[in-house]
Structure formats: C-alpha cells, structure tokens
Amino acid sequence: YDIVLTELGGTVGDIESLPYVESVRQLRWELGREHSLVIHLTLVPYLNAAKELKTKPTQHSVKELLSLGVQPDILACRTEHPLGIDIRRKMAQFCNVETSSVIEMIDAETIYDVPLLLLKERLDSVVISKLHLKDTKEPNLTSWKNFLGKLKNPLHEVKIGLIGKYNELPDA
C-alpha cells in the first residue's frame, strides 16, 4: 500500500486508548516523520455566552498526546463556526504545528459534503506535501458533485419505514 489510514477513537489519555496511542508512537518512531503522519481530530467548541471559539480543549488534548510521545502533524478541527486566521495561528503556535496544518472541519449539511470541504481546506495538499508524495494530479470530483446535487435537490419524495430500537434518536 502507498498509504494506510488508521483511526484511534476515544479520548486522548483514557486508559482504554493508551495501548493504541503507544502503537502509533512506536510506528512513528520506526517509519520516521517522512513516512508517517498524525492527524489529531479535535473539537473547537463555540461558547455562545462569550461569542467565541475556545482553543483550550485542543491545546490540552495535544499536550496530553505530547506527554504520550506523539506530536500531531495536522489538527483537524471540528467546529460550528469558521476558524479565523487568528484562531488558526493561536492553535498552530500552542500545538506546535504549521498554520496551514490547522484544518477547519465545519459542521456540514450532510456527511457527503465533507470531502469537498476538506478539499477546500487543502487537506489533500498538506498530506501530499508532508508525506513527500509525487503524484499530485487534481482529483476529478465531477461524479461526486453530481451525486451531491441530486442528494440535495431530489426529484421525488420517498417514504421509508424504519424498524429499530434506537430509531427515534436524532442521529439515527
């Protein structure tokens, strides 16, 4: 394989995830920075009372990762509001990553918007650059955009019956 993606779920520092974080640390040590990449997915909450995004939770989770021997290369920041350049610079400075490596992952209307949002944020370019990959041709997303257009602008309405234990939850 040219690239292997591995997701570690959970919260940094939880006892359940420690063996997996240690595996990432060891793998990073064996492969080196030029052949491995750590993307840290983090929440940047918006406090309505203060009308501001809070970066402290991200700073603390990165600090915890660092204490376990893992330095993220990219911060993928889940957020309800756009990350301004000042917020990006602040997170870059306090989390020891490049400003271009602070990627906004703003809440999307549908999960199918996410690839286009990440392309807009240039995540692909950052990954290609950090891994020193040669093939940098532009992706052809015409089919994806057509699919997304049909999804967002349906021609017909279909009623679907759903049977299940937890289907009343909003995210079901």
Q: What are these language model-derived features?
A:
Residues 5:
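Generic enzyme active-site microenvironment
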